[in-house]
């Protein structure tokens, strides 16, 4: 059998479950009204678009999206952008909200979120189940992960990458492996992670992406459901319980393309979210959103092109080293090194620098803004200065991050809340 057909068979026999119910509490007010996977990224996308696009580009066409925390905007986005698949052709993207199938509880953990959907997975008759995190930004060919899983004879395979120990401490599941990448030990979010072989500054961290043989997964979930002391979590409970008696392997994260650096970002803090968006402004960013070989799919709103108006010496509409999305109007203002999402308006004599501006924001005249995140629907009053003095920002009720990024939301401006 050719390698292409072999991979095609593997992906056709796989059901992917994307866990998209998390809040992302380290993002503070930015996730007060939306789940983290519904958060905007890169000018026109939402975070959930990245694992979904990875599935489609990898040939996996049966996908479930598990939702829970403040899921309205996430559900609406998936229905609009991903509802065109045809069930009769064996392809679908289904939304799986917490519905108390097996108990009166909502999803209690990552493993419980899968356990409560066993009947839906079983109906699809997959040979393999892929469980994916829905709150990271990355490009990954899941077909390579599936092939490694099948060829190793594994019961479970955990996708992993090397991260600095200081970054992993308290944040990532960390594993120990042998020469064949068999997992020998696993700790969930240890405060003192064990380092990688031969590299005392790095450790092998779980990406939260797993492949299981289907019946093996069901057996382990049922056992875990009977354990009253379990946290119902893959990293805390399932993986540590199975590594001694079963074949559990690690799969090092690779780029979707040869000779290209692998890209993965955890945008779980205000600083990391801001930084990951700023990286896109590089002439050759690590994440190439313009690569036609691996497109990132999303809901395409019907919007007019961006417009730049006025060309006077003291009133010139322009954007430099920036991403400016559809429906934006830069009216006699200057935008530098910033990411502007859909339908942002920046009015005359204002300056926006080094900022991430989410959809439907209006910056009125004579404003100066830098190193900021402006949440959706903000209306910045005329003459307001943001990002130049952190004490003044805090006095206005804005949040300033550890690295000096100022977050502004509608609530902080005294506007009606509930924008998603």
From Swiss-Prot:
Record InterPro entries: ADP-Glc_PPase (IPR011831), ADP_Glu_pyroP_CS (IPR005836), GlgC_bac (IPR023049), GlmU/GlgC-like_hexapep (IPR056818), NTP_transferase_dom (IPR005835), Nucleotide-diphossugar_trans (IPR029044), Trimer_LpxA-like_sf (IPR011004)
Enzyme class: transferase
Any Pfam family the entry gives: NTP_transferase
Molecular-function GO terms, alphabetical: ATP binding; glucose-1-phosphate adenylyltransferase activity
Keyword flag Nucleotidyltransferase: yes
Residues that bind alpha-D-glucose 1-phosphate: 107, 173, 188-189, 206
Transmembrane segments: none
EC number: 2.7.7.27
Stretches of the chain forming a coiled coil according to its record: none
Pathway, per record: Glycan biosynthesis; glycogen biosynthesis
A biological process term (GO) from this entry: glycogen biosynthetic process
Entries under PROSITE patterns matching the protein: ADP_GLC_PYROPHOSPH_1, ADP_GLC_PYROPHOSPH_2, ADP_GLC_PYROPHOSPH_3
Catalytically driven reaction(s): alpha-D-glucose 1-phosphate + ATP + H(+) = ADP-alpha-D-glucose + diphosphate
Keywords: ATP-binding, Carbohydrate metabolism, Glycogen biosynthesis, Glycogen metabolism, Nucleotide-binding, Nucleotidyltransferase, Transferase
Family of this protein: Belongs to the bacterial/plant glucose-1-phosphate adenylyltransferase family.
Subunit-structure text: Homotetramer.
Function as written in the Swiss-Prot or TrEMBL entry: Involved in the biosynthesis of ADP-glucose, a building block required for the elongation reactions to produce glycogen. Catalyzes the reaction between ATP and alpha-D-glucose 1-phosphate (G1P) to produce pyrophosphate and ADP-Glc.
Record-given protein name: Glucose-1-phosphate adenylyltransferase
């Amino acid at each position: 059998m050719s390698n292409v057909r072999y991979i095609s068979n593997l992906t056709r026999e796989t059901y992917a479950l994307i866990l998209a119910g998390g809040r992302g509490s380290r993002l503070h007010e930015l996730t007060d009204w939306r789940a983290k996977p519904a958060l905007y990224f890169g000018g026109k996308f939402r975070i959930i678009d990245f694992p979904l696009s990875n599935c489609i580009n990898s040939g996996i066409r049966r996908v479930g999206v598990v939702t829970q925390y403040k899921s309205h905007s996430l559900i609406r986005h998936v229905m609009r952008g991903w509802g065109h698949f045809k069930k009769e052709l064996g392809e679908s993207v289904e939304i799986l909200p917490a519905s108390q199938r097996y108990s009166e509880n909502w999803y209690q953990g990552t493993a419980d979120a899968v356990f409560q959907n066993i009947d839906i997975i079983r109906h699809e008759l997959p040979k393999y189940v892929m469980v994916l995190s829905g709150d990271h930004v990355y490009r990954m060919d899941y077909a390579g992960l599936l092939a490694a899983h099948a060829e190793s004879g594994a019961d479970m395979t955990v996708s992993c990458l090397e991260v600095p120990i200081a970054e992993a401490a308290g944040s990532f599941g960390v594993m120990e492996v042998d020469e064949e990448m068999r997992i020998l030990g696993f700790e969930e979010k240890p405060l003192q992670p064990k380092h990688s072989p031969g590299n005392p500054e790095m450790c092998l961290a779980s990406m939260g992406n797993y492949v299981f043989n289907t019946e093996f997964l069901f057996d382990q979930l049922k056992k875990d459901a009977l354990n009253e002391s379990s946290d119902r979590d893959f990293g805390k409970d399932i993986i540590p319980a199975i590594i001694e008696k079963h074949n559990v392997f690690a799969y090092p994260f690779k780029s979707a393309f040869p000779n290209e650096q692998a890209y993965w970002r955890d945008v779980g803090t205000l600083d990391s979210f801001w930084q990951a968006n700023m990286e896109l402004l590089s002439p050759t960013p690590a994440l190439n959103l313009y690569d036609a070989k691996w497109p990132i799919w999303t809901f395409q709103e019907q919007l007019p092109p961006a417009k730049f108006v006025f060309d006077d010496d003291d009133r010139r509409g322009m954007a430099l080293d920036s991403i400016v999305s559809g429906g934006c109007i830069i009216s006699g203002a200057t935008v530098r090194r910033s990411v502007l999402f859909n339908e942002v308006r920046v009015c005359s004599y204002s300056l926006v620098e080094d900022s991430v501006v989410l959809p439907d924001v209006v910056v009125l005249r004579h404003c100066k803004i830098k190193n900021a995140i402006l949440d959706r629907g903000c209306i910045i009053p005329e003459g307001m200065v943001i990002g130049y003095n952190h004490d003044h920002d805090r006095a206005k009720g804005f949040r300033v991050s550890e690295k000096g990024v100022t977050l502004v939301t509608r609530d902080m401006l005294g506007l009606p809340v509930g924008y998603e």
